[in-house]
Curated annotation (Swiss-Prot):
<comment type="similarity">
    <text>Belongs to the universal ribosomal protein uL11 family.</text>
</comment>
<protein>
    <recommendedName>
        <fullName>Large ribosomal subunit protein uL11</fullName>
    </recommendedName>
</protein>
<keyword id="KW-0694">RNA-binding</keyword>
<dbReference type="InterPro" id="IPR036769">
    <property type="entry name" value="Ribosomal_uL11_C_sf"/>
</dbReference>
<keyword id="KW-0597">Phosphoprotein</keyword>
<keyword id="KW-0689">Ribosomal protein</keyword>
<feature type="modified residue" description="N6-acetyllysine">
    <location>
        <position position="54"/>
    </location>
</feature>
<feature type="cross-link" description="Glycyl lysine isopeptide (Lys-Gly) (interchain with G-Cter in SUMO2)">
    <location>
        <position position="40"/>
    </location>
</feature>
<dbReference type="Pfam" id="PF00298">
    <property type="entry name" value="Ribosomal_L11"/>
</dbReference>
<dbReference type="InterPro" id="IPR020783">
    <property type="entry name" value="Ribosomal_uL11_C"/>
</dbReference>
<dbReference type="GO" id="GO:0022625">
    <property type="term" value="C:cytosolic large ribosomal subunit"/>
</dbReference>
<comment type="subunit">
    <text>Component of the large ribosomal subunit. Mature ribosomes consist of a small (40S) and a large (60S) subunit. The 40S subunit contains about 33 different proteins and 1 molecule of RNA (18S). The 60S subunit contains about 49 different proteins and 3 molecules of RNA (28S, 5.8S and 5S).</text>
</comment>
<keyword id="KW-0007">Acetylation</keyword>
<comment type="function">
    <text>Component of the large ribosomal subunit. The ribosome is a large ribonucleoprotein complex responsible for the synthesis of proteins in the cell. Binds directly to 26S ribosomal RNA.</text>
</comment>
<dbReference type="InterPro" id="IPR020784">
    <property type="entry name" value="Ribosomal_uL11_N"/>
</dbReference>
<keyword id="KW-1017">Isopeptide bond</keyword>
<dbReference type="InterPro" id="IPR020785">
    <property type="entry name" value="Ribosomal_uL11_CS"/>
</dbReference>
């Protein structure tokens, strides 16, 4: 027999899903079925919570306590950059591996770095800013109409000042 269900126990489940869509509930079922939750209801809740992130792959953190699920969106750096580009959502099924040829400001990069600061491995904010610039390079966008790696070189040479915190 399984152990008795403890109503105060908190379980945390991380899921990758596409924003604004109800993922296949068959994928949710093995993860949250044993915790006494309905996969269909949780799928609808996730779709509602990720409405702002339409068409982007994001991580969702489910905190489950007493058969209630709290949903928290944990966006990746690339998802934040693509959202900052303000591109219209594209059809995932038609286009794969899209290069985003937009342009964002250095201030937006700094804001994204501040949001990602707690998850970064860098010691200072300037290191986190360089991480985000590297991600911007991978996404394929420009920063202040320049290639992101040129800005990284400028930060290393002291030409561009990074905020302290």
């Amino acid at each position: 027999m399984p152990p008795k269900f403890d109503p105060n126990e908190i379980k945390v489940v991380y899921l990758r899903c596409t924003g604004g869509e109800v993922g296949a509930t068959s994928a949710l079922a093995p993860k949250i079925g044993p915790l006494g939750l309905s996969p269909k209801k949780v799928g609808d809740d996730i779709a509602k919570a990720t409405g702002d992130w339409k068409g982007l792959r994001i991580t969702v953190k489910l905190t489950i306590q007493n058969r209630q699920a709290q949903i928290e969106v944990v966006p990746s750096a690339s998802a934040l950059i693509i959202k900052a580009l303000k591109e219209p959502p594209r059809d995932r099924k038609k286009q794969k591996n899209i290069k985003h040829s937009g342009n964002i400001t250095f201030d937006e990069i700094v804001n994204i770095a501040r949001q990602m600061r707690h998850r970064s491995l860098a010691r200072e904010l300037s290191g986190t800013i360089k991480e985000i610039l590297g991600t911007a390079q991978s996404v394929g966008c420009n920063v202040d109409n320049r290639h992101p790696h040129d800005i990284i070189d400028d930060i290393n040479n002291g030409v561009v000042e990074c905020p302290a915190s």
